[in-house]
Swiss-Prot record:
SUPFAM superfamilies membership: Radical SAM enzymes
PROSITE patterns given in the database record: RADICAL_SAM
Entry cofactors: [4Fe-4S] cluster
Name of the featured protein: Lipoyl synthase
NCBIfam families: lipA (TIGR00510), PRK05481.1 (NF004019), PRK12928.1 (NF009544)
Record-level GO cellular component terms: cytoplasm
Record's subcellular location: Cytoplasm
EC code(s) of this entry: 2.8.1.8
Co-factor binding details: Binds 2 [4Fe-4S] clusters per subunit. One cluster is coordinated with 3 cysteines and an exchangeable S-adenosyl-L-methionine.
UniProt cross-references to Pfam families, sorted A to Z: LIAS_N, Radical_SAM
Domain Radical SAM core: 80-297
Keywords in alphabetical order: 4Fe-4S, Cytoplasm, Iron, Iron-sulfur, Metal-binding, S-adenosyl-L-methionine, Transferase
Species for this entry: Vibrio cholerae serotype O1 (strain ATCC 39315 / El Tor Inaba N16961)
Disulfide bond entries: none
Length: 321
């Protein structure tokens, strides 16, 4: 029997080390068992442009993180080339250990007090008009990090008065009331919280999360801020059925959510949950039609869609695939 990992504060645990900490064990996928990517999942990545280097340099200068890099997003090159990025606040170490996610797990350091000001200045320097702010889960904080989100919103608007801010928040497990109170005076322009998958798969995909809790977070925020759109996203290809996804869409609408993203799950490594199937583009198109029929005002559905992929276009209701 191997010794349990003794986590040190500020150390990132990834891949096999991270998966070893999950109660539901996921055996590494052998190369011969990995599903071959279909043609529609093969994209030509743009060259490592100067724009990409400039954005990375701006991040490093102010000790900031992008979820694009930390979660190994396949759209990084495209988004960076277009001058957009999703900033990840509260550090790059998550207190959760979801087996689909490539963000490192461990004992995070205390939040950096100057991060909101640094973030606001970086956004100003990059001349962004729409920004997405997300974070790792911070179960070690009394409010789950909600006040830090509010501080970032306030500082960003102070330097960038015409900007639109979308926040992609964690579930604030056990801290919903205090978290929503912290966000009360500085809400975002779009409030995003991902359900990720169907409730049947939560124990495997989102250990530590609760489907009904996440729905309630979306409902309560909308109740307190009726003019702020709420948004959620799901991954496809983890073993869910189309019928289960439709039921989740109905639940989201019943809780006031009007913006939706559906995308293909891609395993970051053989140590993560394997891809059960690659969903054809036509099926994404069908689900988009279902979503619009259910009353979603915006639905971005396609193999490469992610929560923050072209989020500015999503917010305008433009086509994103």
């Amino acid at each position: 029997m191997s010794k349990p990992i003794q986590m040190e504060r500020g150390v990132k645990y990834r891949d096999a080390d991270k998966m070893a900490l999950i109660p539901i064990k996921n055996m590494p996928t052998e190369q011969k068992e990995v599903l071959r990517k279909p043609e529609w999942m093969k994209i030509k990545l743009p060259a490592d442009s100067q724009r990409i280097q400039d954005i990375k340099a701006a991040m490093r200068k102010n000790n900031l993180h992008s979820v694009c890099e930390e979660a190994s997003c396949p759209n990084l090159a495209e988004c960076f080339n277009h001058g957009t990025a999703t900033f990840m606040i509260l550090g790059a170490i998550c207190t959760r250990r979801c087996p689909f996610c490539d963000v490192a797990h461990g004992r995070p350091n205390a939040p950096e007090a100057e991060e909101p000001k640094k973030l606001a200045q970086t956004i100003h320097d990059m001349k962004l008009k729409y920004v997405v702010i997300t974070s790792v889960d911070r179960d070690d904080l009394r409010d789950g990090g909600a006040q830090h989100f509010a501080d970032c919103n306030r500082e960003i608007r102070a330097l960038n008065p015409h900007i639109k801010i979308e926040t992609l928040v964690p579930d604030f497990r056990g801290r919903m009331e205090v978290a929503l109170e912290a966000l009360k005076d500085n809400p975002p322009d779009v409030f995003n919280h991902n359900l990720e998958t169907a409730p049947r798969l939560y124990r495997k995909v989102r250990p530590g999360a609760n489907y009904k809790w996440s729905l309630e977070l979306l409902r309560q925020f909308k109740e307190q801020h009726p003019h702020v759109p709420t948004k959620s996203g799901l991954m496809m290809g983890l073993g869910e059925t189309k019928e289960e996804i439709v039921e989740v869409l109905k639940d989201l609408r019943a809780h006031g959510v009007t913006m939706l993203t559906l995308g293909q799950y891609l395993a970051p490594s053989r140590h993560h949950l394997p891809v059960e199937r690659y969903v054809p583009p036509a099926e994404f198109d069908e689900l988009k039609e279902v979503a619009l029929e259910l009353g979603f005002t915006h639905a971005a559905c396609g193999p490469f869609v992610r929560s923050s992929y072209h989020a500015d276009l999503q917010a305008k209701g433009l086509e994103v695939k």
